Structure formats: C-alpha cells, structure tokens
Amino acid sequence: MRAIVSIALLSVRLGAQTACPAGTTEVRPGNCEAPHDPPPSILDYRPKSTLVTPAHFVKVAKYPAIDFHGHPDELIMSEQGLETLHKALDGLNVRVMVAADNVSGGELRDAVAAIRASSAMRDRVRVLAGIDFNDVGPGWAERAVKQLDADVAAGAVGVGEISKSLGLSIRKRDGSRLKIDDPALDPIWDECARLGIPVFIHTADPWEFFQPVDYTNERWLELELFPGRRYPKDRFPSFEELMTERDNMFRKHPRTTFIAAHMGWHANDLASLGAMLDAMPNVYTEVGAVLYDIGRQPRASHDFFIKYQDRILFGKDSFQPSEYPYYFRVFETADEYFDYYRPYHAFWKLYGIALPDSVLKKVYFANALKITQGLPR
C-alpha cells in the first residue's frame, strides 16, 4: 500500500517553510508520498529523455581554436606523444594548445626542446612557466624573478596555470598561509608586466565545494566521489576570502594581464563575473571545465558572451578529445536539452548559446593572440 503522509503531521520545518520527510516527495500541496518500489540510488537513476528536438553534433570547431587551458602532460615530452597530440588536435580543429602544466627550469626546457624538434608540432604547442611558491620569505622574490626570466628566455609564453594551492594550502617560510595578495609576490606580477606576458591563474574551486556536503548541495555526488575536493571552514579559508584576495591582487597590478581560469568560478553567477571584468580591465577569463554552468543558462550566457566577447578565451582543461565537441555544440548551435559529458559534475542538461561568427572567432583564437605575443600567428 502506498504511503501517503500529511505534511502537517510529519513535515520537517526549515525556517518558515516545510519539507517532506526523508524517503517521500510532495505529490500534491500538503501531501507527501513514498515510491511503490524501493528507489534507486542517485548512481542508478538514469532517465532517458523522450524530447525530440533538432540535434547538431559538432565534431570540430568552426574556426581554428587555441586551447589556452591545455594539460597534455607527458604527450609533449616525446616524438610519439606529440604525434598522438597532433592527430587529436587536427581531428578537433584545435590549431594551438597552450600547455598550462606549471613547469619550470629543466622540465620546461626539455618540453620546449621536444616541441621544437617536431616538424609537425613546433607551431602547434606553446608552454607556460610555473612559479614555485614554496618557502616564500626573504630572498624568495629575487630567485623567483630570475627563474621566470630564464623560463621566458627558454620559450615560455606566459605564467600558469597557477594552482589553487596558492591561497588554499601553501605556507610561507614562517608557517603562515600564503595569501594570494601577499606583497611578497608583487615582484613576480610586476615582472610579468615588464615582460609583457599573461598570468593564467586558478583560484579556489566551485563555491559548492566550500559548503556543507548535504542533500541540498548541487555537487553532492562529486564531493562523495572525490572527498579531497571538500574545503571545510575549520581547515580552509572561505570561498569569499579567496576571491577577495585574488581581486586585490588583480587591482594592485593594473599593468599585468591576468586570465581567471574556469571563468573565475563565477559561471554560476555571471553578474559577479561581469562586475569583476568591468572593474578590472586587465583581467580576462577562460571557459575550461565550467561548460555545465554556461550551458544551463543559454540566454544569460549568450548575452554575457556578446557583452564580454573581447575578454573570454577558449580552454578545455583535462585533455580528453571526446569532450571537446560538447563545447563546440554549446557555443555554435541552438540545440536544446542535451547531455553533458560528466554526470557527476552536473545532473542537468545543456543548451546551445548560438554565438555569432564574429564572437566565435574572438573566443576561439583572437583574444588569446591579442594578449599572448608568443603564440603562433
């Protein structure tokens, strides 16, 4: 017999509102009901949509793209790996990959040498330089600037991807947390301005990762699958604190070009991202790993990309060739209600934002070329 319970009797009060008891759902105002059969787990419930709409599967980018958020890792260290990368990029119409693997010194020189030795890839891959933020204290800045100069001389075209560990976990020599806007780091950002190279920085993680892991958290499944992505407030600074430090750094260095990776983790709040871009003309942003937010608000995303078309770069993050076409489909079509490629990121569907060609060209390649002088033309 189906269990129908009165919300007046068994409701759970949440402030001025009420909610059905666990294991039930509201089927009519004031009535909660449990399923006939035991419900599946969130992992096993995979409903198939019956919606019939036009579908346009976009296998290659409409214009030759620059992936500014590449992580090819070991693929760029050998002739065989570069050949594998070559075939994958050609199949996607990705003209250039920027390796944002935070390498420096000998590792960077080895990567650049391998790339330059490849006739097929010497004009297809560029490398960003890493910064070692460990042991910040007296004398650190001078050494870091010297290493950065050497890395740029060796072929680096920018700095990055600066890891989220800056701000979250790295400690200074005195044991205190290294804040993103620490004055000790100013010489590095000033040197980037002098060299005319951009800084590609990943700050914090999605806001949800800093919230309680309960059944109201949109990223509950991801945080259960990857518990290391949780940032409880008793161990880490808050999301808001990290964003404040990041923005302070951006403001302090108006001559330095910064690229906020992952749309600054503001793709779920485009008004906040727009306010940041309005306030700081030296800041750009990049779309890697936030397609799930871009594609669930197609009208707002379309308008945002139109307004800030000169400030957005294309990037993918994790190098999985099969996932790039989802970006192309969102950016280039008006398709409705289609799957995202990682269910644990998002249990919702995506919509195309149908960007005009003039904007696609800027996002795919022109903006990256504008701010990164070392990229192949």
Model-assigned labels for residue ranges:
Residues 234-377:
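H/E-rich (His + Asp/Glu) clusters that bind or coordinate divalent metals
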Residues 14-22:
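Boundary at the C-terminal end of the N-terminal hydrophobic targeting segment
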Residues 42, 110-229:
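Active-site gating/metal-coordination segments in enzymes
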Residues 32-120:
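An N-terminally biased module of ancient metal coordination in phosphate/nucleic-acid-related enzymes
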Residues 64-70, 96-99, 125-130, 159-161, ...:
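Hydrophobic faces of well-ordered beta-strands that scaffold small-molecule active sites
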Residues 25-27:
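Extracellular, cysteine-rich, disulfide-stabilized repeat modules with beta-strand cores
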Residues 73-81, 100-110, 134-142, 169, ...:
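Acidic-and-aromatic substrate-binding clefts and catalytic sites of carbohydrate-active enzymes
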